[in-house]
């Protein structure tokens, strides 16, 4: 039986607020310990990320993308299915140019409804095709410095 809609909604709002706040602790606050984050499309071949991997990745990413802004355009919540989808645009500054990405972010709630236990996120493929190589080169340069 799904968790009450009000509980799921509070968790969904906590997830969005954490994303908007753009701090590792805030963003991860709604994630369950076993939460998995999957990059879409599946054909991108990016392996799922565990919470433990994300806890290491986010501080690095969040220090690179500054002046982060989240604009949510649509949220659809299906309490009976314990899931929701968020369509949003994010912008930020980076050392190698502006960041502007579109996201379709699908989230699933655990049995209690108090945590997100799965995330599948579709990014703007056109933007990411140009941005990811710059991001990877920047991170590599920082690690070598």
UniProtKB/Swiss-Prot annotation:
**Highest taxon listed in the record's lineage:** Eukaryota
Pathway in which the depicted protein is active: Secondary metabolite biosynthesis
Q: Which GO terms describe its molecular function?
A: monooxygenase activity
Looking up SUPFAM superfamilies in the UniProt record yields:
NTF2-like
List the InterPro entries: Fungal_Meroterpenoid_Isomerase, NTF2-like_dom_sf
Q: Which UniProt keywords apply?
A: Monooxygenase, Oxidoreductase
Per the UniProt record, which EC number(s) apply here?
1.-.-.-
Q: How is it used?
A: Secalonic acids show unprecedented anticancer activities against various human cancer cells and might be interesting for further derivatization, targeting diseases such as cancer.
**Cross-referenced PANTHER family:** AUSTINOID BIOSYNTHESIS CLUSTERS PROTEIN F-RELATED, AUSTINOL SYNTHESIS PROTEIN F-RELATED
What this chain does, per the entry, is described as:
Monooxygenase; part of the gene cluster that mediates the biosynthesis of the tetrahydroxanthone dimer secalonic acid D. The pathway begins with the synthesis of atrochrysone thioester by the polyketide synthase AacuL. The atrochrysone carboxyl ACP thioesterase AacuM then breaks the thioester bond and releases the atrochrysone carboxylic acid from AacuL. Atrochrysone carboxylic acid is decarboxylated by the decarboxylase AacuI, and oxidized by the anthrone oxygenase AacuG to yield emodin. Emodin is then reduced to emodin hydroquinone by a yet unidentified oxidoreductase.
Q: Know the name of this protein? A: Monooxygenase AacuP
Q: Which organism is it from?
A: Aspergillus aculeatus (strain ATCC 16872 / CBS 172.66 / WB 5094)
Lineage, please?
Eukaryota, Fungi, Dikarya, Ascomycota, Pezizomycotina
